[in-house]
Curated annotation (Swiss-Prot):
InterPro entries: 3-IsopropMal_deHydase_ssu (IPR004431), Aconitase/3IPM_dehydase_swvl (IPR015928), AconitaseA/IPMdHydase_ssu_swvl (IPR000573), IPMI_Swivel (IPR033940), LeuD (IPR050075). Heterodimer of LeuC and LeuD. It comes from Clavibacter michiganensis subsp. michiganensis (strain NCPPB 382). This is 3-isopropylmalate dehydratase small subunit. The keyword Lyase applies. Catalyzes the isomerization between 2-isopropylmalate and 3-isopropylmalate, via the formation of 2-isopropylmaleate. Keywords: Amino-acid biosynthesis, Branched-chain amino acid biosynthesis, Leucine biosynthesis, Lyase. Belongs to the LeuD family. LeuD type 1 subfamily. It catalyses: (2R,3S)-3-isopropylmalate = (2S)-2-isopropylmalate. One of its GO terms (molecular function) is 3-isopropylmalate dehydratase activity.
């Protein structure tokens, strides 16, 4: 997972509230067995609207999504985060997030910042006035900026640290690799343990 300190790019105003994970990526796409390639599934039902942002040239290559309250509610599905990430988004700002979605985002390298509803309206107004406007989301300073506009956002310290360091669950575990190895060597030999992978298995 790549570390995140600052995200700068085209901002998208998603003027919808209560966007659940099924709207972000419908269930029929959950049958895929890879963790990438979900950009075509993002907001699949809404793509049929010619006015929706994915069909607007001004928002091509967007990296910052500014959504209404209660974004990412509903069932837990990492695919929602993968779809946003694969499309190109690196940060999402909203007054409220679904707790599970927010947790999944931090583990998958997607910054989710909590901003007030008034500040969301201010960001939307700026993007409406200039479609394709660049926004900067600064994780170090915890502020989002556009020309002439600065708004603060909240993010818990643990998730902020993981994003700044670029630590997914595997990388986080490997930080303690020496301690894990020491524990395994001291553990009684009669206890269950994971056997080393056979060379033939590694070749397949």
């Amino acid at each position: 997972m790549e570390p995140i300190t600052r995200v700068t790019g085209t901002g998208v105003p998603l003027k919808r509230s209560n966007v659940d994970t099924d709207q972000i990526v419908p269930s029929q796409f959950l049958k895929r067995v890879t963790k990438t390639g979900f950009e075509d599934a993002l907001f699949f039902q809404w793509r049929k609207d010619p006015a929706f942002f994915v069909n607007q040239p001004a928002y091509e290559g967007a990296t910052v999504l500014v959504a209404g309250p209660d974004f990412g509610t509903g069932s837990s599905r990492e695919h929602a985060v993968w779809a946003l990430r694969d499309y190109g988004f690196r940060a999402v700002l909203s007054p409220r997030f679904g707790d599970i979605f927010r947790g999944n985002s931090g583990k998958q390298g997607l910054l989710t910042g909590i901003v007030t509803e008034d500040d969301v309206e201010r960001l939307w107004a700026a993007m409406d006035a200039e479609p394709g406007l660049d926004l900067t989301v600064d994780l170090v300073e915890r502020i989002a900026t556009a020309p002439g506009l600065t708004v603060p956002f909240e993010i818990d310290e643990y998730t902020r640290w993981r994003l700044l360091e670029g630590l997914d669950d595997i990388a986080l575990t490997l930080r303690d690799e020496d301690a894990i190895t020491t524990f395994e060597h001291r553990r009684a030999s009669w206890r269950p343990r994971t056997l080393p992978a056979r060379p033939a298995a590694l070749e397949n």
